[in-house]
Amino acid sequence: MINFHAKRAENKVSRKAHAIINNNFCPLGHLNMLNIQQFIRDHVTGRQQSMFLPDIQANTTKLTQEIKNKKVLVIGGAGSIGSSYIKAVLPFRPAQLIVIDLSENGLAELTRDLRSTEGMYIPADFRTYTLNFADSIFERLFRENGGFDIVANFSAHKHVRSEKDKYSVQALLENNVIKAKRLLDLLTEIPPQHFFCVSTDKAANPVNIMGASKRVMEDLIMAYSDRFPVTTARFANVAFSNGSLPASWLDRLSKKQPLVAPTDVKRYFVSPEESGQICMLACMLGKSGEIFFPKLKEGQMKTFSSICDDFIMAMGYEKKNFDTDAEARRFASEMPADSKLYPVVYSKSDTTGEKSYEEFFVEGEKIDIQRFTSLGIIEEVKIRPYAEVDKFLEELQTLFCRADFTKADVVEALKHFLPTFEHEEKGKNLDQKM
């Protein structure tokens, strides 16, 4: 019998929590008791077990059939979602696992994590490589390996802050779309049995360039759905994932810096474990061309400020509100190590690209909510002709070759391709805030 829990050994203290304890500033001595996973269950998702566990258990035979003794490639596997996907897949005993990521340190930690987890199955052929999947060395690896049965791509720009100027916008679209096409073209040489590429809820009625890039990515992979099976998933924020606002609170505590959060931005949340499971279910059980999403109710959305309130209490503090960043920084720099108050700055969102709410599907998309207990599916997705998508990508690359192109030019090009894209430029980005 597959042990779904053996793949996840819960450290009582997160790696970042250890860093805080070892720092000169140890908040009240309470942090060494922090269990991040339990905090997520109690205060973020409100679920004591994964919402996807019933569907995994109900489909164990099928999942085993699709994964056991197969060759698996995970691109961007050192990140939060990619590593969680790996932990979800390994109990089904693939014959080979190759992980690609640009983060050498991340791959080292992934390997240590897997090999330090009690009960974790690791195939004899397990390899990690620090390289770009758009490089020629990756193409050589792919061909000499004889391709892969399962390919999952988690390499992406995921932050709304990635649209601050023309350079960041070009990098975002190069990575999320143009390089993704290069990968898809390579896969046509030795087609996989399953191809999965992660999307985002922000692809539904996008209001920022990151979300728009993911919507284009969806159109792109669907254009290949007649060449090999492709699926994707739009899902919620991953609680305390790398680079997320909640994860940054741990860093701020370690450096004795204020905590910040928007009061008017509501988000759905899944745990890191759940993020990998939804991707595995979509990848292995989906029909080509389908888009998956978690069946979460509107009432389950939470504001970051409410989560921050609970986090501060869990750390043994009382929050002290400040109206300005400067006031909060000053208080933080002067507060004693045994302070029972901790500075926070809560404010309404005022930066470009922030969407006040989340949605997984839009009007006109055909939804199936019966097939799985925890997952909804957008089926019969309208597939844009390959030539149409390819033409748009060529137009983007031509635009990027112009020395005088602007961010506004890119927005207009995206609006032409995505009529539902409603971008509002506010002249302020997240890099200008704490």
Annotate each language-model stretch with its function:
Residues 7-13:
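Short, low-complexity, charge-dense intrinsically disordered segments
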Residues 21-71, 419-433:
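Non-catalytic terminal and boundary segments that flank Rossmann-like NAD(P)-dependent oxidoreductase
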Residues 62, 221-434:
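Strand-loop microenvironment adjacent to phosphate/nucleotide-handling motifs in alpha/beta enzyme folds
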Residues 75-78, 83-89:
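N-terminal Rossmann NAD(P)H-binding glycine-rich loop of SDR-like oxidoreductase domains
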Residues 88-99, 115, 122, 131-174, ...:
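NAD(P)H-binding glycine-rich loop region in Rossmannoid oxidoreductase-like domains
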Residues 95-109:
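Conserved glycine-rich Rossmann-like NAD(P)H-binding loop of the short-chain dehydrogenase/reductase
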Residues 153, 157-174, 178-215, 223:
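Conserved Rossmann-fold NAD(P)-dependent oxidoreductase catalytic core, especially the SDR/UDP-sugar
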